[in-house]
């Protein structure tokens, strides 16, 4: 049995958790949403300062909630890539310091691998190989999960990530931050078929379109032009709910098509979804319905495990530690690192 304390500070949540194999002993998340809401997005310097203020109380709370001492901890992990450099450094420095003081191995964890491992926390018997649709504010990827640390990226976004597109459209409609949950809520009150918006397609040099890659910048521009047109017409109040529903419908439909096509082309029968956009009701409904028609299994983590948390980081670290993967004390943080290069962290 392996018990790991994990730390996640890659963006705007300070999170600490203790996981025993695939069982959560404690999970603490201090969100900074209210702090960044006034700016309409995450301010890196503010995020780093807030992490510094909250990291130690979060660590203490995680230990107290789990009713464990440092003697019960087998390893200490932190997200080291990708993310905001200053924010990552807070978690990495805290983890390394604790590991040195308490003579524990240190493990640097890839943030996207953490989102993949969120599936294991709610489905402990889930095993590779499977396809993971990872959709968040910074990433939109289709990843073939072959084993711990062994990943093949089959699809990605060529511009905006799905979550980023939600935030930008929400800002365009003056809905506030973060945009994803607000648009999702409004979409339930709107008509998703009122506006015909374009699905982003990525052209190939030899002709045709990439079957798995996404593009959301064109969709975002289409919403902008539609809003400008509706404002000029002034025939009625701006139909915010219908716009939100039509936008969400287009994103969910596009991601579902690419995910199902990718799974079938690669003969993968199990699909997991991770990242903040995995909480979106439109995506959940579309993907579950499409998977059922094709006799594919699809799993969405509980909502609390879709957004950034440290339990997923600790869970990934448990598997790496059991395989003897330990990071060097000289390991630094990186703003970018492909998921295929996870093993360079050990």
Swiss-Prot record:
**Which cofactor does the UniProt annotation name?**
Fe(2+)
As to how many cofactors bind and how, the note says: Binds 1 Fe(2+) ion per subunit.
Which molecular-function annotations from GO does this UniProt entry contain?
A: iron ion binding; N(6)-L-threonylcarbamoyladenine synthase activity
EC number(s): the record gives 2.3.1.234
Q: From what superkingdom does this record's organism come? A: Bacteria
**Which gene name does the record give?**
tsaD
Q: Per the record, GO CC terms?
A: cytoplasm
- Keyword Transferase set for record: yes
Q: List the taxonomic lineage.
A: Bacteria, Bacillati, Cyanobacteriota, Cyanophyceae, Oscillatoriophycideae
Under Gene3D superfamilies, the record lists: 3.30.420.40
Q: List positions binding substrate.
A: 134-138, 167, 180, 184, 280
Subcellular locations according to the entry:
Cytoplasm
Query: This chain belongs to which protein, by name?
Result: tRNA N6-adenosine threonylcarbamoyltransferase
Report the catalytic activity.
L-threonylcarbamoyladenylate + adenosine(37) in tRNA = N(6)-L-threonylcarbamoyladenosine(37) in tRNA + AMP + H(+)
Give the coiled coil ranges.
none
Residues bound to Fe cation = 111, 115, 308
Entry-linked Pfam families: TsaD
Q: Name one GO biological process term.
A: tRNA threonylcarbamoyladenosine modification
